[in-house]
């Protein structure tokens, strides 16, 4: 009873903080960056991280197993993974671009997970026999950590593409008036400065996208391999090509292609960012979209209206 009450308290606290953070982030986005608001949002993110950690711990105690058995629980763990990456980025103090991505991801994922939309899925039940294994923590946690890192890296690539293809403003190129000429040269100076800043920003986005996706790819690979071993123990086959396994393999292939393109200088930047952006969509199909189908060996993670 105490654990259940604590779980509800932590859920409401995390949802309240997330609601406040959304307001703060929107205020920072619509206006110039305000130092105090930014610091408040960062502290709020740290509090959210500890709240989600406490929520996972109370779930674990209350349910008797690590909370990764259905979509609702995995969404909470996904938001925790985003918050973990954000906390690491925050304490390194040189990855502001990554922090911006991870904070938004944490806010919206946790907000969705605790908003009540998934109320039907949040009803706790006894684990199905296939999930009553020590492999549950290793396989599912590594997969979701991999998804979180890959999603963050992909969003950095999406930002890179937006900045790259954004059209620059047109400047006066012909003017006999002294005032217009002066304005022209000033704008050329600003234009060159902006181009330099834009180039530096693109390079930084490309660098961090590569670093984060590389980390996520390692988690994804180990997660798939551990899942294959677990599948052999549970179902007698390492691979069954059910929808979740198939899309996980497609996700792995897409990001393997991304890492390959990063090895060639001619394909770095925009080309690799396009691949990562495709990967962003593939991950959501694998993680969320397949659950709408409710078919295959992983149907226990589906929406209640679609699983049999």
Swiss-Prot record:
Localization per Swiss-Prot or TrEMBL: Plastid membrane
Main location: plastid
Keyword entries, A-Z: Cytochrome c-type biogenesis, Membrane, Plastid, Transmembrane, Transmembrane helix
GO BP annotations listed: cytochrome complex assembly
Source taxon at top rank: Eukaryota
Coiled-coil residue windows: none
UniProt KW Lipoprotein keyword: no
Regions crossing the membrane: 2-22, 44-64, 71-91, 143-163, 212-232, 239-259, 273-293
Record's GO cellular component terms: plasma membrane; plastid membrane; thylakoid membrane
InterPro entries for the chain: Cyt_c_assembly, Cyt_c_biogenesis_CcsA, Cyt_c_biogenesis_CcsA/CcmC
GO MF, one example: heme binding
Pfam families on file: Cytochrom_C_asm
Protein topology in the membrane: Multi-pass membrane protein
Function as written in the Swiss-Prot or TrEMBL entry: Required during biogenesis of c-type cytochromes (cytochrome c6 and cytochrome f) at the step of heme attachment.
HAMAP family the UniProt entry points to: CytC_CcsA (MF_01391)
Family per similarity comment: Belongs to the CcmF/CycK/Ccl1/NrfE/CcsA family.
Subunit text: May interact with Ccs1.
Name of this chain's protein: Cytochrome c biogenesis protein CcsA
Gene name of the encoded protein: ccsA
